[in-house]
Design a protein with these regions (language model features):
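N-terminal helix-loop segment corresponding to the beta1-alpha1 unit
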Residues: 1-201, 375, 381-409
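Aromatic-enriched alpha-helical interface/lid elements that frame and gate functional surfaces
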Residues: 245-321, 325
Length: 409
């Protein structure tokens, strides 16, 4: 099925058209946040240091221009400028960019902007009272861990996330995707949108303090809440759910199947579907609490039945009967799946760019991939000109190494 047959094909200027975001972030959490904003029409000016966002080099794989899939995946729809913020002239240029900006987002070590004379409370809030300043850090500026840098895998470990991921045999395991970084990016985007909505009422901007640590701890449901209620430390259960069963991976003839049975009706329909109606009336499995307490016995009985079926038709049949079930797909399986294509979650833009799609579909103002990730410094001259800097001044800034159109190696 081609993307053109999807009901989401039309693209608009976007719900955030007219908003300007000055993006000083690099790596993942911040760039993911600003890509979400850019997908929905915000003008995002990606201000890169002279060496560029280091993720441009995080590969392989690389495209034919030598840029990594990692960088390409979270930087579409943006305009890139190179700017040396360690220089006074660079800071002055940043000040010009902020004059008509709605949002400033950065992920420097806490205190960096203050050291540069650009702290929110003392400078930015006074000079740009409508500016929303979002700071993304590992742990925040204060508290026992305040000021330390944060990294996704380290925060997964420190937050307790790894302690409940994996199996008794494997021990703690890092989640395969950078959930903390990306969850933090989502939280930053949500916070920015809330602040812009509130600004429409008050006329004032505000400072947003978003951390990887907070984002990771907030994801500890239900294990964190189970502990707060029971006082019992959660343990690693592998793929199984700590509160619900059968909620686990089961082998079939050809591929693993995941079941997520959450109530008695679903369990009865599952039992009927695998020609084992006796399971639904077995007193050991009469409700979720019993099924969860007797999960070992139930898993063995279900595994014996499920092994007789091929995964894909079984999963589809269960879904049609209202039983939550799905094959354990590989990444290639997902990228080629007709539903992925139908939902436009695999998209292309200019220059052969291909990436994951836009997850929020809006009916009147849909977003999308308007342009691929920018070449370093490709908008430097244009953005500085739009900020009121003359052509002669721009060339002087470039010649002095303050503004850049090519990466400094």
């Amino acid at each position: 099925m081609s993307p053109d047959s999807s009901p989401f094909s039309t693209m608009s200027a976007g719900a955030l058209a007219g908003y300007k975001v000055v993006d000083l972030t690099r790596v993942l959490g911040g760039p993911y946040c600003t890509m979400i904003l850019a997908d929905h029409g915000a003008e995002v000016i990606k201000v890169e240091p002279p060496q560029g966002d280091e993720t441009r080099d995080w590969g392989p794989p690389f495209n034919d221009k030598g840029e990594s899939a990692y960088y390409q995946g979270v930087n579409r729809n943006k305009r890139s400028i190179g700017l040396d913020l360690s220089s006074e002239a660079g800071k002055a240029v940043l000040g010009k960019l902020l004059e008509d900006a709605d949002v400033l987002i950065e992920n420097f070590k806490p205190g960096t902007l203050e050291k540069w004379g650009l702290g929110y409370k003392d400078v930015l809030a006074e000079r740009y009272p409508r500016l929303v300043h979002c700071r993304v850090t590992g742990f925040g500026a204060d508290g026992p861990l305040g000021g330390f840098p944060g990294y996704d895998a380290v925060i997964q470990a420190m937050s307790g996330m790894m302690s409940v991921n994996g199996s008794p045999e494997s021990g703690p395991v890092r989640v395969g995707t950078p959930m903390v970084d990306m969850g933090t990016g989502l939280n930053a985007a949500i916070a920015i949108l809330m602040a812009l909505l509130e600004r429409g009422k008050s006329g004032k901007g505000q400072f947003l303090d978003i951390t990887l640590y907070d984002s990771a701890v907030a994801l500890l449901h239900p294990q964190g809440n189970n502990y707060l209620m029971s006082g019992k430390p959660p343990v690693i259960t592998g793929n199984a759910h700590p509160n619900v069963y059968p909620y686990d991976v089961f082998p079939t003839k050809d591929k693993d199947l995941f079941l997520a049975v959450g109530n008695n009706g679903q369990f009865k329909r599952l039992a009927d579907a695998v020609e084992a109606p006796e399971l639904a009336v077995d007193p050991r499995f009469k409700d979720n609490a019993d099924r969860s307490s007797n999960r070992g016995a139930l898993k063995a009985l279900l595994a014996e039945k499920l092994a007789q079926y091929e995964c894909e038709p079984l999963a589809l049949g269960l879904l049609q009967k209202g039983v939550p079930a799905g094959p354990v797909n590989t990444i290639p399986d997902v990228m080629e799946h007709p539903h992925t294509i139908f939902r436009q979650m695999r998209v292309g833009a200019e220059n052969g760019y291909g990436a994951l799609g836009v997850q929020a579909k809006l009916s009147r103002t849909p977003g999308g991939a308007r342009s691929g990730p920018p070449k370093f410094g490709s908008a430097t001259r244009a953005v500085l000109s739009e900020a009121g800097i003359s052509a002669d001044e721009i060339e002087t800034l470039i010649n002095d190494g303050v503004a850049l159109v090519d990466r400094r190696k």
